[in-house]
Amino acid sequence: HAGQIQGFFDIPVDNLFSTPIFARHARKKIKSKKIICVAPDVGGTERARALGKLLNVGLAIVDKRRPKPGQSQVMNVIGDVQNQTCIIVDDIIDSGGTIVNAAKALKARGAKEVYVYITHGVLSGDAVKKIKNSVIKNLVITDTIDNVEKTKNVKNIEVLSISGLMGEAMKRISNS
């Protein structure tokens, strides 16, 4: 969730990033030439910038507020998303409110399509239903949390395996 977490352990910890896996997937999946990476909030700017750098595309940021816990309200979109294919990237999706609201705001500002890449899909409550009924063309989550049953009949949710990343990390640790 945050690189700083490594400081709380008394043993070596490797923080693994799904960004290269997301970039590889996006290059295959998204055919548009007009792409922009989007942070769903100011806190996710570095994550979106990292994916944008790998894809060689620009950056936009959704400025949101939380009027109450569990609720998010989009205030503004920083960056030009008009006629762009937007790729939102985040670390965790729980209730889905932030991502669904961000996607809706991007479409309202002229985005052609909205793709979403999330490392950890908690998908609590009615999150799957929110995503299924949203403007999101495709939401990709990794398999760090088992969501096969929750997502198996949802056309716009895809689960991407990070077993290769985990296996490579373990191999490198055991060989060092």
Predicted regions and their residues:
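PRPP-associated nucleotide enzymes
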Residues: 1-176
